[in-house]
Protein backbone atom coordinates (compact mmCIF):
# COMPACT_ATOMS: atom_id res chain seq x y z
CA UNK A 1 0.00 0.00 0.00
CA UNK A 2 1.25 3.49 -0.80
CA UNK A 3 2.14 6.20 1.70
CA UNK A 4 -0.49 8.63 0.37
CA UNK A 5 -2.92 10.33 2.72
CA UNK A 6 -6.59 9.26 2.56
CA UNK A 7 -7.72 12.70 1.34
CA UNK A 8 -5.29 12.40 -1.60
CA UNK A 9 -7.05 9.20 -2.70
CA UNK A 10 -10.70 10.26 -2.25
CA UNK A 11 -11.24 13.38 -4.38
CA UNK A 12 -14.97 14.01 -3.92
CA UNK A 13 -18.28 12.21 -3.44
CA UNK A 14 -20.54 11.86 -6.46
CA UNK A 15 -24.09 12.94 -5.67
CA UNK A 16 -26.59 12.08 -8.42
CA UNK A 17 -30.04 10.50 -8.52
CA UNK A 18 -28.53 7.10 -9.22
CA UNK A 19 -25.94 7.36 -6.43
CA UNK A 20 -28.64 8.50 -3.97
CA UNK A 21 -30.75 5.48 -4.88
CA UNK A 22 -27.74 3.18 -4.35
CA UNK A 23 -27.10 4.83 -0.97
CA UNK A 24 -30.65 4.39 0.27
CA UNK A 25 -31.37 0.91 -1.09
CA UNK A 26 -28.03 -0.92 -1.02
CA UNK A 27 -25.75 1.07 1.33
CA UNK A 28 -23.36 1.85 -1.56
CA UNK A 29 -21.51 5.16 -1.79
CA UNK A 30 -19.94 6.63 -4.93
CA UNK A 31 -16.69 8.63 -4.98
CA UNK A 32 -14.34 10.13 -7.52
CA UNK A 33 -10.89 8.78 -6.66
CA UNK A 34 -7.33 9.27 -7.87
CA UNK A 35 -6.77 7.66 -11.26
CA UNK A 36 -3.93 5.46 -10.01
CA UNK A 37 -5.63 4.38 -6.74
CA UNK A 38 -6.07 0.65 -6.16
CA UNK A 39 -9.01 -1.06 -4.44
CA UNK A 40 -7.11 -1.70 -1.18
CA UNK A 41 -6.03 1.96 -1.08
CA UNK A 42 -9.62 3.12 -1.61
CA UNK A 43 -10.87 0.78 1.12
CA UNK A 44 -8.20 2.06 3.54
CA UNK A 45 -8.99 5.72 2.72
CA UNK A 46 -12.75 5.35 3.23
CA UNK A 47 -12.30 3.46 6.50
CA UNK A 48 -9.88 6.11 7.84
CA UNK A 49 -11.85 9.17 6.69
CA UNK A 50 -15.31 8.06 7.79
CA UNK A 51 -14.66 5.47 10.57
CA UNK A 52 -16.76 2.79 8.86
CA UNK A 53 -16.23 -0.84 7.83
CA UNK A 54 -16.01 -1.42 4.05
CA UNK A 55 -17.38 -4.67 2.65
CA UNK A 56 -16.52 -4.30 -1.06
CA UNK A 57 -15.05 -1.80 -3.56
CA UNK A 58 -15.94 -1.67 -7.26
CA UNK A 59 -14.01 0.67 -9.56
CA UNK A 60 -14.41 1.89 -13.11
CA UNK A 61 -12.61 4.35 -15.33
CA UNK A 62 -14.95 6.86 -16.97
CA UNK A 63 -13.88 7.45 -20.56
CA UNK A 64 -13.23 10.97 -21.86
CA UNK A 65 -16.12 12.60 -23.70
CA UNK A 66 -15.89 14.76 -26.79
CA UNK A 67 -16.83 18.41 -26.20
CA UNK A 68 -17.12 21.37 -28.55
CA UNK A 69 -15.10 24.48 -27.82
CA UNK A 70 -16.84 27.51 -29.26
CA UNK A 71 -14.19 29.80 -30.58
CA UNK A 72 -13.81 31.23 -34.08
CA UNK A 73 -12.53 27.86 -35.35
CA UNK A 74 -15.15 25.59 -33.66
CA UNK A 75 -12.62 23.14 -32.35
CA UNK A 76 -13.30 19.89 -30.52
CA UNK A 77 -11.73 18.89 -27.26
CA UNK A 78 -12.23 16.15 -24.70
CA UNK A 79 -12.86 15.95 -20.99
CA UNK A 80 -10.34 14.17 -18.78
CA UNK A 81 -10.76 10.52 -17.93
CA UNK A 82 -11.38 9.84 -14.25
CA UNK A 83 -11.91 6.95 -11.88
CA UNK A 84 -15.13 6.20 -10.03
CA UNK A 85 -15.37 3.92 -6.99
CA UNK A 86 -18.58 2.40 -5.64
CA UNK A 87 -17.99 1.41 -2.01
CA UNK A 88 -20.31 -1.04 -0.24
CA UNK A 89 -20.41 -0.72 3.55
CA UNK A 90 -21.14 -3.39 6.15
CA UNK A 91 -24.64 -3.42 7.66
CA UNK A 92 -25.17 -0.80 10.32
CA UNK A 93 -22.56 1.63 8.94
CA UNK A 94 -23.53 4.95 7.33
CA UNK A 95 -21.69 7.97 5.93
CA UNK A 96 -23.07 11.53 6.13
CA UNK A 97 -22.07 12.33 2.56
CA UNK A 98 -23.38 15.92 2.53
CA UNK A 99 -21.17 16.85 5.49
CA UNK A 100 -18.11 15.52 3.62
CA UNK A 101 -19.08 17.33 0.41
CA UNK A 102 -19.07 20.70 2.19
CA UNK A 103 -15.47 20.32 3.46
Curated annotation (Swiss-Prot):
GO cellular component assignments: cytosolic large ribosomal subunit
Homology family: Belongs to the universal ribosomal protein uL23 family.
Domain of life (superkingdom): Bacteria
The protein, known as: Large ribosomal subunit protein uL23
HAMAP family: Ribosomal_uL23_B (MF_01369_B)
Keyword Transit peptide in record: no
Organism: Aquifex aeolicus (strain VF5)
Assembly mode: Part of the 50S ribosomal subunit. Contacts protein L29, and trigger factor when it is bound to the ribosome.
Disulfide feature: none
GO biological process, one term: translation
UniProt keyword annotations, A-Z: Ribonucleoprotein, Ribosomal protein, RNA-binding, rRNA-binding
Example GO molecular function: structural constituent of ribosome
Keyword flag DNA-binding: no
Function text: One of the early assembly proteins it binds 23S rRNA. One of the proteins that surrounds the polypeptide exit tunnel on the outside of the ribosome. Forms the main docking site for trigger factor binding to the ribosome.
This protein's encoding gene: rplW
Cross-referenced PROSITE patterns: RIBOSOMAL_L23 (PS00050)
